[in-house]
Regions:
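Short, surface-exposed connector motifs at secondary-structure boundaries
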Residues: 54-59, 81-86, 195-202, 266, ...
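A glycine- and small-aliphatic-rich helix-loop capping segment at beta-alpha/alpha-beta transitions
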Residues: 75-82, 106-107, 127-135, 218-226, ...
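Single conserved hydrophobic/aromatic residue that forms the stacking wall/gate
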Residues: 305-313
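Gly/Ser/Thr-rich active-site loops/lids in small-molecule metabolic enzymes
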Residues: 137, 290-304
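N-terminal small/polar loop signature for handling phosphorylated ligands or for N-terminal nucleophile
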Residues: 60-123, 226-281
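An N-terminal, well-structured beta->alpha segment
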Residues: 1-76, 172-200, 211
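Gly/Ser/Thr-enriched, mixed-charge loops and adjacent short helices
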Residues: 3-12, 124-254, 261
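Well-ordered alpha-helical segments embedded in enzymatic catalytic cores
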Residues: 34-41, 98, 181-185, 254-257, ...
């Protein structure tokens, strides 16, 4: 049977960008067993390279809206705890940028984000970050990959219960305090906080069923943008992504509901995030009143153009 062969013919690859695959039973699928294997490898690498200090500093863990993400994140925390490594687990879904921030803010040794970014709904994944809040690069990348690939999934996993991890002080749930610090730092990055008429400037926003709603709505409101309209059909987290089979804000098809709402209320700009909110796309109306969808390169140029020059900084 080809389906059985595909599930078991090889191990799910863990590379420098972590691992990503279809959820399901099998060696070649994302499931609790492969999540535990990846985490055991990460734990082995942390203990081998940073020792007791790294164990005390711990690992931050966040997860997105995808099916299985909550369970995979808890499994990650309990394997780390089983190895004597402190786990800081977000109490509910958070974005990848906030995971990066939390890793630095809590001075953790590493971070783990359970997500498959903008892949179709049947996927999930696991990304590893280092103490600087960035995805692992050399020499950590090769070290973690080799450590993960050396783990025997049946005999090497060290894991304890949630109750035991809490009792030992090896599992700490995090949330509002980190959120507040994250939002504070995000708001400091504003280039111009005193734009005229921003209170009445209409913006349509969509998190595409993902994590963006946790921070984006709050940031815009606190920055004085009071006329923000979130697409109701896409506001709540939903790992099935019922309104968009491919939740990538670089794909203009995901803006269909956003532009319809914008036309209805008279807005000229729409913003959207992918499920883990580390990617943003926009739609804007051109001089003819038609919707235009700048690509990432064009957005980068606009950001560079509006940023202070080194002489102004």
């Amino acid at each position: 049977d080809k389906e059985i062969e595909n599930r078991f013919y090889t191990d799910l690859s863990f590379g420098t960008a972590g691992m990503r695959g279809v959820r399901g039973v099998g060696r070649n699928r994302i499931n609790n067993y492969n999540i535990r294997k990846a985490t055991q490898g990460l734990a082995n690498y942390i203990l081998a390279t940073t020792g007791e200090e790294g164990a005390k500093r711990g690992v931050t863990i966040a997860y997105d809206c995808r099916i299985g993400s909550t369970e995979y994140a808890l499994n990650t925390a309990l394997v780390l705890a089983g190895n004597g490594i402190k786990a800081y687990l977000f109490e509910s879904l958070r974005s990848t940028p906030e995971l990066s921030f939390a890793t630095r803010e809590l001075k953790a040794q590493a971070g783990v984000m359970v997500t498959a970014s903008h892949n179709p709904q049947e996927y999930n994944g696991y990304k590893v970050y280092w103490e600087d809040g960035a995805q692992i690069v050399e020499p950590q990348a090769s070290g973690v990959v080799n450590a993960v690939n050396s783990v025997d999934i049946f005999t090497d996993i060290k894991m304890i219960t949630e109750e035991e991890a809490k009792a030992k002080g090896l599992l700490e749930y995090i949330g509002k305090a980190v959120d507040d610090r994250f939002i504070e730092e995000v708001e400091k990055q504003a280039i111009n906080r005193d734009l005229p008429n921003k209170k009445d400037f209409k913006i349509v926003y969509s998190p595409l069923h993902g994590t963006g709603r946790v921070a984006v709505q709050r940031v815009l409101k606190e920055m004085g943008y009071e006329s923000v309209y979130t697409v109701p059909e896409q506001e709540m987290p939903d790992g099935m992504f019922p309104t968009c089979s491919y939740a990538n804000p670089e794909d203009k098809s995901v803006f269909k509901l956003s532009t319809e709402l914008a036309d209805k209320i008279g807005a000229n700009i729409c913003l959207a995030n992918d499920p883990d909110a580390d990617r943003t796309g926009i739609a804007i109306k051109d001089d003819n009143g038609d919707w235009y969808y700048p690509n990432g390169n064009q957005l980068g140029i606009c950001l560079l153009y509006t940023s202070p020059s080194p002489r102004d900084a």
